[in-house]
């Protein structure tokens, strides 16, 4: 039974790669709460995964989006303007780093990987927010996904930590810029979750074990945990919340060490 927190709202969901993606879990719960959704995919390979998921929950709009290509972004928002006219919320769910550099030393990060990671993981939020602003006629909510590696050193997270730190700072600056139009911008800092992207991080299984052992709730974060937080941030329940980093990590971030 749905409570309809997003009834009558339209939302753009980016970052779905497969049925284990955090963006997919968020989309499922948003749909259950009454939202009409628009999905994007990054490539033809991902199109074959995303379109069946869209069909599964009755999402009628699926478009290609390459955030490194300004024309791809403008085409997407032109389509949204034509079909919807306006919309209410945006999930920024993409991130990138060369998997070969998600192990070893951060100091060995290549310039190409640094540029690509910051562009796709952080600058894309600015680009999408700028385009969304023009179509959020009655205000709106923009949510992105981050991780504790933006604040503290997480072994092997490397350049992604830098990208997420820039992303979190961007959330605060965007919230300030867009607030006058009643557009809220927030980030969800989720605990480590096994996804296609996280599988590239070296020794990820150890990260999961450490998180569960340290977190006050003594478990790992689930996609559904993050989905619930996203629905809250998309909905009018959070109408006074902007510029925040909202932790959904079973309390891991409050701990200084494991219990002795």
Swiss-Prot record:
It catalyses: a 2,3-saturated acyl-[ACP] + NAD(+) = a (2E)-enoyl-[ACP] + NADH + H(+). Transmembrane segments: none annotated. NAD(+) binds at residues 15, 21-22, 42, 66-67, 94, 164, 193-197. InterPro entries: Enoyl-ACP_Rdtase_NADH, NAD(P)-bd_dom_sf, SDR_fam. Pfam families: adh_short_C2. Pathway: Lipid metabolism; fatty acid biosynthesis. PANTHER family: ENOYL-[ACYL-CARRIER-PROTEIN] REDUCTASE, ENOYL-[ACYL-CARRIER-PROTEIN] REDUCTASE [NADH], CHLOROPLASTIC. Belongs to the short-chain dehydrogenases/reductases (SDR) family. FabI subfamily. Catalyzes the reduction of a carbon-carbon double bond in an enoyl moiety that is covalently linked to an acyl carrier protein (ACP). Involved in the elongation cycle of fatty acid which are used in the lipid metabolism. This is Enoyl-[acyl-carrier-protein] reductase [NADH] FabI. It comes from Rickettsia felis (strain ATCC VR-1525 / URRWXCal2) (Rickettsia azadi).
């Amino acid at each position: 039974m749905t409570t309809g927190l997003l009834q009558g709202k339209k939302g753009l969901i980016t970052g779905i790669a497969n049925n284990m993606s955090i963006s997919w879990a968020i989309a499922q719960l948003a749909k259950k709460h009454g939202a009409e959704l628009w999905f994007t995919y990054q490539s033809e390979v991902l199109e074959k995964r995303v379109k069946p998921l869209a069909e599964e929950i009755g999402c009628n709009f699926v478009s290609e989006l390459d955030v490194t290509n300004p024309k791809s972004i403008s085409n997407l928002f032109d389509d949204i303007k034509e079909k919807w006219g306006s919309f209410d919320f945006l999930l920024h769910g993409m991130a990138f780093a060369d998997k070969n550099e998600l192990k070893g030393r951060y100091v060995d990060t290549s310039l190409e990987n640094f540029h690509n990671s910051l562009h796709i993981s952080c600058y894309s939020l600015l680009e999408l927010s700028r385009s969304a602003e023009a179509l959020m006629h009655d205000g709106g909510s923009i949510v992105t996904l981050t991780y504790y590696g933006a604040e503290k050193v997480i072994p092997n997270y490397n350049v992604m930590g830098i990208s997420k730190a820039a992303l979190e700072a961007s959330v605060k600056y965007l919230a300030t810029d867009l607030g006058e139009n009643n557009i809220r911008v927030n980030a969800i800092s989720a605990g480590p979750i096994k996804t296609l992207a996280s599988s590239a991080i070296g020794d990820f299984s150890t990260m999961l074990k450490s998180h569960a052992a340290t977190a006050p709730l003594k478990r790992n974060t689930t996609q559904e945990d993050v989905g619930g937080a996203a629905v809250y941030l998309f909905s009018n329940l959070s109408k006074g919340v902007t510029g925040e980093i909202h932790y959904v990590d079973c309390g891991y971030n409050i701990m200084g060490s494991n219990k002795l």
